[in-house]
Amino acid sequence: MQLKHLRTLLSPQDGAAKVTCMAWSQNNAKFAVCTVDRVVLLYDEHGERRDKFSTKPADMKYGRKSYMVKGMAFSPDSTKIAIGQTDNIIYVYKIGEDWGDKKVICNKFIQTSAVTCLQWPAEYIIVFGLAEGKVRLANTKTNKSSTIYGTDSYVVALTTNCSGKGILSGHADGTIVRYFFDDEGSGESQGKLVNHPCPPYALAWATNSIVAAGCDRRIVAYGKEGHVLQTFDYSRDPQEREFTTAAASPGGQSVVLGSYDRLRVFNWSPRRSIWEEAKPKEIANLYTVTALAWKRDGSRLCAGTLCGGVEQFDCCLRRSIYKNKFELTYVGPSQLIVKNLSSGTRVVLKSHYGYEVEEVKILGKERYLVAHTSDTLLLGDLNTNRLSEIPWQGSGGNEKYFFENENVCMIFNAGELTLVEYGSNDSLGSVRTEFMNPHLISVRINERCQRGMEDNKKLAYLVDIKTIAIVDLIGGYNIGTISHESRVDWLELNETGHKLLFRDRKLRLHLYDIESCSKTMILNFCSYVQWVPGSDVLVAQNRNSLCVWYNIEAPERVTMSSIRGDVVGLERGGGKTEVMVTEGVTTVAYTLDEGLIEFGTAIDDGNYTRATAFLETLEMTPETEAMWKTLSKLALEARQLHTAERCFSALGHVAKARFLHETNEIADQVSREYGGEGTDFYQVRARLAMLEKNYKLAEMIFLEQNAVEEAMDMYQELHRWDECIAVAEAKGHPALEKLRRDYYQRLMDTQQEERAGELQESQGDGLAAISLYLKAGLPAKAARLVLTREELLANTELVEHITTALIKGELYERAGDLFEKIRNPQRALECYCKGNAFMKAVELARLAFPVEVVRLEEAWGDHLVQQKQLDAAINHYIEARCSIKAIEAALGARQWKKAIYILDLQDRNTASKYYPRVAQHYASLQEYEIAEELYTKGDRTKDAIDMYTQAGRWEQAHKLAMKCMRPEDVSVLYITQAQEMEKQGKYREAERLYVTVEEPDLAITMFKKHKLYDDMIRLVGKHHPDLLSDTHLHLGKELETEGRLQEAEYHYLEAQEWKATVNMYRSSGLWEEAYRVAKAHGGANAHKHVAYLWAKSLGGEAAVRLLNKLGLLEAAIDHAADNCSFEFAFELSRLALKHKTPEIHLRYAMYLEDEGKFEEAEAEFIRAGKPKEAVLMFVHNQDWEAAQRVAEAHDPDSVAEVLVGQARGALEEKDFQKAEGLLLRAQRPGLALNYYKEAGLWSDALRICKDYVPGQLEALQEEYEREATKKGGRGVEGLVEQARQWEQAGEYSRAVDCYLKVRDSGSSGLMEKCWMKAAELSIKFLPPQRSLEVVRVVGPQLIGIGKHSASAELYLNLDLVKEAIDAFIEGEEWNKAKRVAKELDPRYEDYVDQHYKEFLKNQGKVDSLVGVDVVAALDLYVEQGQWDKCIETATKQNYKILHKYVALYATHLIREGGYAQALALYVQHGAPANPQNFNIYKRIFTDMVSSPGTNNAEAYHSWADLRDVLFNLCENLVKSSEANSAAHEEFEMMLLIAHYYATRSAAQSIKQLETVAARLSVSLLRHTQLLPADKAFYEAGTAAKEVGWENMAFIFFNRFLDLTDAIEEGTLDALDHSDFQDTDIPFEVPLPAKQHVPEAQREEVRDWVLTVSMDQRLEQVLPRDERGVYEASLVAASTGVRALPCLITGYPILRNKIEFKRPGKAANKDNWNKFLMAIKTSHSPVCQDVLKFISQWCGGLPSTSFSFQ
């Protein structure tokens, strides 16, 4: 351990002012320093001074300086300080828990001499030494002190051991004395231990020895029994002075001694068992150390000095940071401090046995400490500061720790589970188990306190997968073992350990009651289960149901509610309990009934007052009633009678409540008079016994107290007179007779004649008793009494009276007995028969009336049958000779043997119908032979067959059937029966039936249908062995589809289809299976291929490991290369077989070469070290440059071969010069010579020979001469030469043939020259026919080499005009072709023109085509999309052509959405009245009125263009055949609409015309057949709203919203037209295909309409005019008169009409003047344009005084 100076707590003074004593509190939070001026300073753990107080003298008269403080110590709870003073007193000050609390003296102990030292080792016990040598004990609880031991020598030092249970005192004479309060089993001696050479002022008691030092400057370490262990002698050190004080670390592993300017540190070495001195802490000017105090956690040491200074030191062996979250400070080998860096909390971990702490871990969500020493294990909970140390032998660090339980650490090691409770130094217990899963272990440690049970510690765990053991951890014995039929996968005890829940793998939830050892299954399909914390309420989930057991004692009573997700947890807090359920992506909380939970908890805890208080808050329901009943029962058992009274009141049990109330009053009175609870008073106990209906116990309690009267009163109150009289008799009570009389009188008064009769009978008065019995209507009792007394039988009148009463009461048997007794057999027999007493009747008849016996036997049998006593009736029927009845009775009684016996005695007809019933019984007993015999006797053979069939006895059934049925009927029967068996799932039986009738195919089909493939295969193999293989294959495919792979494998392999098996496993990723099958069934190399594919699927090192494991690595690399998987091959070789890499590179290069990737192949060849292969590759592909480059760079020896190869290629291309150069570079002139010879180029051959191989020249010349003679020619030159020779010889025909044979692809000039020469010779010298043939051959050949003019000239020489023209056409020499046609044969002029057009078309030369064929050119423009050029060109043509292409362009634009450009076309070129164009005009109109952004002044020109085009169209229609047609009228209407739109846009540009614009928007509504209705109503509503016409706006917006809804729904059926009745706004309008108003604007309208509707300030009616109709309607509904619309507003003109020249055109004068005035004031050009159009449309304007100049 090392000391590091931290801070100065108290600065030293200039002179002597020593610190007399210091002390740290037990909780490490406070540090006290007592100075020379007797003031106690209090510091916090960080060294900040927080408080102080002054000590006081024993007697103030001596003054404050009359004493010194010699000892000071904190109490174990850190709230008090004991101060030992030299004025013979000890004060105990209560300083409180908080700083600043008032300091009060709570104890004082006056002594006989000065207190010299003081310790406070344990609660209430202060130990102190006195100057007179005594060591005494002060008890703060009793406020008394006593002497522990006494010596004659001044006590100079006092210390305690680490546990505080032993004290050590040092005395002035050197004596050191030891005393134990508890030696803790150490066996160490007490008393004088050692005599030190000097007074041991510095005395410390460490773990393993005692260290003492003093003025002799020697430090001595003594053993446990006082022998010297070590001595440290500093007497010869001139720097050292006397040792004044010592302190041992809290762990006892270190000791610090103080002297002058120095602190000496000694550390105990456990390994060497000696003290080792550390480097001393020397501080100049510290002066003498007078006091030392070590913080309880060992982390700080404080030293007080002679000059009044206090220095604080940090003490540690080492420090480390754990996971950047915790600081571990080792203050000693066996002690360390764990500090949480984030929260600052600290825990002191210490080995109580002094073992060195070796390893510290913080586990379990950083809450739990685990540390090892050599022999122990340290555990701790950082949150609760509960620490444990248990013996633990090292197990190699293989322990597994589980921290799921907050009270217990579970340690699993080598199959053994050890439980350690935090804060306990003993393990709770150990058990053997292999199942270390927190869900399979449940520990409950005092989790809920119960009445009468202080400790409750239980464990449940798995012994094996199906056996649960429950252990009581306190006693260490087994309290329950549960053996279950299936594997357990979860278990948990409840908090009290009385119930165990567990769930098995079948998701069945079971509850086990430990006390009764009963197991109950409470839920199926349980996916979640948990006890509610703090209660015995259980929550579980079953599929979509949440199940809650509020009372687990009644597991059948479960509260269920439906949920839609999965339960994920429980949360309890804030007075409620919630079950958290995930529903999709959200979590929903289901709240439980907190009241029911609370009640159960209160009951379990025995807190019945709390349970009552809770129940009083609930309404009375069946569940609440059950809880009240439970509480009443428990309260009675616990003798809590007031609670029980309240329960019965709540339950409405008034009598019990009242009875308990009276009982409580008795108990309370007794309690007040005699003390105690009062429930033990005998009256209270008796009344409780009465409440439980245990009257004998109550009687016994009364009689024990000799309270006979009270017992009798009890019985009388209960009307139990018999017991009352019995008590009176037993106790000889004087009122016995009176009781009896009173009882009899009471019986008579209450008409209890029977009881009175019994009383009289018991007293011997028979007649009176009979009279009372008869009066009570009990003649049977009277008869019984008469029959027992002969004297009463003699009374005939009495007997008659009784028999009459008996017969009247239908007690015939008793009457018969009486008649028989008085010898009247006839009446007796009648009575017996009436009373069904046939036994007595028959016995009487046998004696008195024998003839009646048979009749009576039959009647007796009938009676027994009625009584269902059929068995007894059989013999009676036999006696009565009633065979049929006997048979029926035997059958009914199931007396089958008797029935057979009786049947065998009957004739066949009678018996036949009964045999089958008996046979059915024997068939059910499987006694088939007897049953068959009976069926046969009963002529029911078919039933016998069915019996055998159902029993599976097909052979017997078939044998029997063949005897009595046709074979085909047998087949039908068996197949039908087999189908029934199949339906019942009895497939084997069905199979036997099918096979029996030789229909195995039906059985095969059945097995296939039900997927019983083994049986199917068995039958196929037996009956169709030729189809067995195909069947296996088919089944394999089916099973593979179903995912039943192992079964599929079997069938594939049986079908010899191992490849299918392998592919199946491969596709499912089951490579091991695929490999196994391939290796077992696939021949020598199949498994290698599978292994390769497997490895490829893994890739990387995994593939290498696999292949190495299988021993197929090299084979796999070869296989990868063979299959062109070079990347995989490279990967494998790189990872494992690097020597294979060049080979793979070579194979990869060859692959790339085959693929034509030569550059990549070149690189791979070079990487493979095979550059020559790359050269050969390039040579093979005649890439000479690359070949030469590679050869020169990587293989110089191949350069010559490359040049030779290149030369060979040049020769093949007839490039002899190049070939020659290459061969000469390769220094191979001989080869060049041979090539020239082979090519017949003898002149070049001779030249080469002469220049490079002159030695062979002569031989070459001779060879040339021989070759020339042999061939007569030398190639092309030879042909030309030969031709010339023939020409010179006059053989022109042969010369022509030779010229025609010339073919030299390298010289087209030579060929042309030769062919022209041939033609020239043929024309000049050969006959015309021959010359024609030659020209026809030469002409095409010349054309073929591009000599079209020469070919044409040849043709013209022979007047072949068409061929000449074709030659010019093919050569694209059109002018020459035209000239030839024109001059030589005009018939071909059109021919040339047609080809020229085709040529221009094909070449796209439209500009040139225009001059030839304008329509074709225009079509070509259209095809090319050059519309502007097309229209421009068409403009130059006639009107019809122009408008054809205008229409085409307009159609194109409209399709592209460019209606505006289409409109502009017709503005520019006019709108002809072609019916073909009508759809275009309509489409432009529709697109324009549907387009957004047109309801503004800026859109005027667009509307004006539309208006002008439509006006132009209508003007053209008037002049056409379409005048006045429906189309004409429609376009007139469109013109009017366009005019309204244009006028509206114009009006929108001028503020004063806004009402005109609004009216135009409203007028447009009458044209909604042609306009999008939603847009029109929206614009009308908007306009009306802007000018303040809110009624109209409201109605129009309503209509607009209805229309938008109709568009969404796709139908107008739901529209309400009531607002537009009697208007000309149409109801039937086209449904717009889409919304024309954006969503935002629709929402604005919706909000406005809703606001107005809420205000209710508008009437939902349209404004009316003087006609009484809607003001914008042209038609008056009442008269049908139609008004003209105003040209300016569209509204009807009712007066002040201005008429125009054109009929039907007029304007309202006011609107007209308003419009003119606006134009005059604004000079608006658009409004002027409107007037201009009206003038043009209506034939001029009316006379007006306004001028626009």
Curated annotation (Swiss-Prot):
Gene3D superfamilies: 1.25.40.470, YVTN repeat-like/Quinoprotein amine dehydrogenase. Signal peptide: none annotated. Highly expressed in the testis and pituitary cells. WD repeats lie at residues 14-53, 64-103, 110-148, 150-191, 195-233, 238-278, 284-323, 483-520, 521-559. The modification Omega-N-methylarginine is found at residue 672. Required for the maintenance and formation of cilia. Plays an indirect role in hedgehog (Hh) signaling, cilia being required for all activity of the hedgehog pathway. Interacts with IFT88. Interacts with IFT57. Interacts with RABL2/RABL2A; binds preferentially to GDP-bound RABL2. May interact with LHX3 and LHX4; the relevance of such interaction is however unclear in vivo. Belongs to the IFT172 family. This is Intraflagellar transport protein 172 homolog.
